[in-house]
From Swiss-Prot:
Function text: Required for the normal development of the wing and halter imaginal disks.
A GO MF term: RNA polymerase II transcription regulatory region sequence-specific DNA binding
DNA-binding region as annotated in the record: 367-426
SMART domains (UniProt xref): HOX (SM00389), LIM (SM00132)
Name this polypeptide is given: Protein apterous
Gene designation: ap
Native source species: Drosophila melanogaster (Fruit fly)
Amino acid sequence: MGVCTEERPVMHWQQSARFLGPGAREKSPTPPVAHQGSNQCGSAAGANNNHPLFRACSSSSCPDICDHSTKPFGNAYGTESFRSYETADRATFEDSAAKFSISRSRTDCTEVSDETTSGISFKTEPFGPPSSPESTSDSKITRNLDDCSGCGRQIQDRFYLSAVEKRWHASCLQCYACRQPLERESSCYSRDGNIYCKNDYYSFFGTRRCSRCLASISSNELVMRARNLVFHVNCFCCTVCHTPLTKGDQYGIIDALIYCRTHYSIAREGDTASSSMSATYPYSAQFGSPHNDSSSPHSDPSRSIVPTGIFVPASHVINGLPQPARQKGRPRKRKPKDIEAFTANIDLNTEYVDFGRGSHLSSSSRTKRMRTSFKHHQLRTMKSYFAINHNPDAKDLKQLSQKTGLPKRVLQVWFQNARAKWRRMMMKQDGSGLLEKGEGALDLDSISVHSPTSFILGGPNSTPPLNLD
């Protein structure tokens, strides 16, 4: 076997001193020789005479550095060539060459070992962390998260539901009791691994409290319900006289308190001014609550302070105590007091309930008519159009509604009242003749000239608010 017969590129250091070690000699195609080992060099050259890089030197005295060592390799090694050993320190080179020739025999110089090329084994590391039973189980858990908790199938839909830290198909999330789909519900409840809707959960597991004694109510206990309030059967009685109320009895609710019909009528009789007062001033203060004070800024002057448990109707209040305020405006036809107390207009905090009859008595008393006040630009627009047309149609009312921002019903009533006033003035003019001089321009309530449009120029500030039926 020849020396370095494999034609492969070899790494060469730029500094020539790196070639001085034995390791560099093993990889070099032309190991340097010293004067003491000239026979070895000749034998090595003779053993590979056919190779162009190892031809014998023709000179009688072979120098330490042969000329062929500076020649470049063939195309297999590229265009890079070895640097000449002449650039190295000569003394250092001779010393290392002598040691190399002594330590290596002829066979070692001519024999090529495969250890230089195949002695190093490369270890290829796999990509990613090593697999383990724990990582394998984690990947299985990740895959299981994509499965529906209801049917167990993989969720491939674009949208899904997430409830109780699980994923569901939109059609699989149902109540366990009533099988009602919960995809449109805002909340659901879980108990023992089952999903319930709100109604079934409270009916099975919910613990409500009595609105009077505040004690818990079990699911198998009979209760009395009034609106959103729940009472024990024994607690469902009048707050004042403690009369038990059974199915079919009439009662009233004021601030979550139950009253019988008699005491409810007394409570309602003291407040007839407005229904909104019941939300600000609870009726419990009328019965002499210990928190009620005559000097309090929130006390109602129309209410008399009476001891707790004593109820005095408003008609029996002695002289000197403040009387209930009278309602302003024209008098209305009033119903009997015993009926009015249960058919009056009651606000959100008070309600008459007919327990067990299936329907509640609605308010039948007529409320006050709403009064509308117009702004100056609205009056100018309506008066200008009234000068042109006294009876606008639906199309004209729609245009006026867009200009003024008023509803069509309001505009219709205004034109109706304006036409009535204009007719009355025309009849008055026909009966009394011309108006006196110096009276000035009038509004819709009066006319100063014969023309039906002359009152349009009157001051808008004098126009009173109009009544809407």
